[in-house]
């Protein structure tokens, strides 16, 4: 059996010790686009992530599951670079967290499904990386009508 990593399928027998819920970065895309390096210094983030996860690899970690959802700044290019440099299997996610976002209210279930399935079939952010997990997080208020639509 295989699972998708950001660098391609990995046999589950080769996953080794797994960090199940990590976030290489949580950096809002609208902030990144509007403020650039004043808000997000990609090279520094990459170096920091490689340093920290490189230490984890030295301690026996072989796989990292990055649960950063689309709307919290998931960055597959960062994940791919960290995977290449550290030798770790990095598993990306697709899906949303606290989905009370206005744009979701204007989409029907099929459109939301198509967005997420595009990650799974076409790849994430213009790459051939595909998600290995589906993120489905909700707020303390529970499943609202909008969240019910998204989760469905």
Residue ranges of model-derived segments:
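N-terminal basic/disordered segments at the start of proteins
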Residues: 2-22
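Short, charged N-terminal helix-start/capping segments
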Residues: 1-9, 65-71, 79, 91-96, ...
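Alpha-helical scaffold segments that flank or form the walls of functional sites
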Residues: 16-27, 33-88, 112-130
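Active-site gating/metal-coordination segments in enzymes
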Residues: 81-84, 89-152
């Amino acid at each position: 059996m295989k699972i998708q990593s950001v660098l391609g399928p990995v046999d589950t027998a080769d996953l080794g010790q797994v960090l199940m819920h990590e976030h290489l970065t949580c950096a809002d895309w609208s902030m990144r686009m509007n403020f650039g390096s004043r808000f997000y210094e990609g090279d520094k983030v990459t170096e920091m992530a490689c340093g920290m996860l490189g230490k984890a690899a030295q301690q026996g970690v072989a796989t990292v599951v990055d649960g950063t959802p689309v709307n919290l700044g998931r960055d597959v290019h960062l994940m791919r670079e960290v995977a290449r440099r550290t030798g770790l299997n990095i598993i990306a996610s697709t899906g949303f967290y606290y989905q009370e976002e206005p744009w979701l209210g204007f989409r029907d279930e099929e459109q939301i499904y198509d967005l997420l399935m595009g990650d799974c079939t076409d790849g994430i952010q213009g790459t051939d990386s595909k998600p290995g997990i589906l993120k489905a997080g909700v707020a303390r208020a529970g499943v609202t009508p909008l969240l019910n639509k998204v989760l469905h």
